[in-house]
Amino acid sequence: MTADRPALRTGDGDTRLSFGSNLSSFTEYLRGHAPELLPENRIGHRSHSTRGGDGMESGDLAPHGTTIVALTYKGGVLLAGDRRATQGNLIASRDVEKVYVTDEYSAAGIAGTAGIAIELVRLFAVELEHYEKIEGVPLTFDGKANRLASMVRGNLGAAMQGLAVVPLLVGYDLDADEEARAGRIVSYDVVGGRYEERAGYHAVGSGSLFAKSALKKIYSPDSDEETALRAAIESLYDAADDDSATGGPDLTRGIYPTAVTITQAGAVHVSEETTSELARRIVAERTEEGGSAR
């Protein structure tokens, strides 16, 4: 005769899982037990106005991350971002981290309201880890993309007040039929719509138009990792040249774009030594050419 397993209490403020729980989504569990901890609920909501007391839009009251680029290459995919955050017409920070590894085979970059976006991506990483612990297997890439879409959709109320978050997800799909198609890029809109980017490159944020224009000229799907990384940094340089909210390589302060590469071996942060060397080389070449793009 066996005794029933006791259940953990789930009273107010108790966020522990009960025995036998099959809830594999940490976000949904949090929504049911401690909704105030979700990124979209950590701000004060205004019922009728998006303007602050001084007449500023809500979106100008918090720092914003700007430009993120992603591109596939032979054997993998990479994600890179500039380091600047702006607040209205001011530079709020020069060294923000906007590119995050979310699990062994995926990474996400953020554009939009920095505070909410950073919390959302960190929660997404916990979501993926929680799912794998509960189910015993990792989510497929499509599953990851769908989970992130639902999290972005959950921020719609804040987005309607000007505090939008627009992530860019990349990953290596272990279930892909061809290794050449294993690197994948997924973009989102503010209401949680997800879009597979099949051109091999994409960009989000205020400088995305200029970054994509640059990538259109220099991108090659058959490039190796170093060539792809150079293309990403060069596109961010071009974006910073025309968009004041995007920060280019800052040689004076030693601030350079950050990047993550993902291959069959997993996700890896590109070292600052590598990005700084490429950035210095690009700046030197542009200086010799009189500031013109090649």
From Swiss-Prot:
It catalyses: Cleavage of peptide bonds with very broad specificity. Gene3D superfamilies: Glutamine Phosphoribosylpyrophosphate, subunit 1, domain 1. It is found in: Cytoplasm. Its main location: cytoplasm. The formation of the proteasomal ATPase ARC-20S proteasome complex, likely via the docking of the C-termini of ARC into the intersubunit pockets in the alpha-rings, may trigger opening of the gate for substrate entry. Interconversion between the open-gate and close-gate conformations leads to a dynamic regulation of the 20S proteasome proteolysis activity. One of its GO terms (biological process) is proteasomal protein catabolic process. Transmembrane segments: none annotated. It is an enzyme of class 3 (hydrolase). Residues 1-65 form a propeptide. The keyword Protease applies. Its EC number is 3.4.25.1. The keyword Cytoplasm applies. The active site is at T66. Pfam families: Proteasome (PF00227). InterPro entries: Ntn_hydrolases_N, Proteasome_sua/b, Proteasome_suB-type, PSB_actinobac. GO terms for cellular component: cytoplasm; proteasome core complex, beta-subunit complex. GO terms for molecular function: threonine-type endopeptidase activity. Keywords: Autocatalytic cleavage, Cytoplasm, Hydrolase, Protease, Proteasome, Threonine protease, Zymogen. Pathway: Protein degradation; proteasomal Pup-dependent pathway. The 20S proteasome core is composed of 14 alpha and 14 beta subunits that assemble into four stacked heptameric rings, resulting in a barrel-shaped structure. The two inner rings, each composed of seven catalytic beta subunits, are sandwiched by two outer rings, each composed of seven alpha subunits. The catalytic chamber with the active sites is on the inside of the barrel. Has a gated structure, the ends of the cylinder being occluded by the N-termini of the alpha-subunits. Is capped by the proteasome-associated ATPase, ARC. Component of the proteasome core, a large protease complex with broad specificity involved in protein degradation. Belongs to the peptidase T1B family. This is Proteasome subunit beta. The gene is prcB.
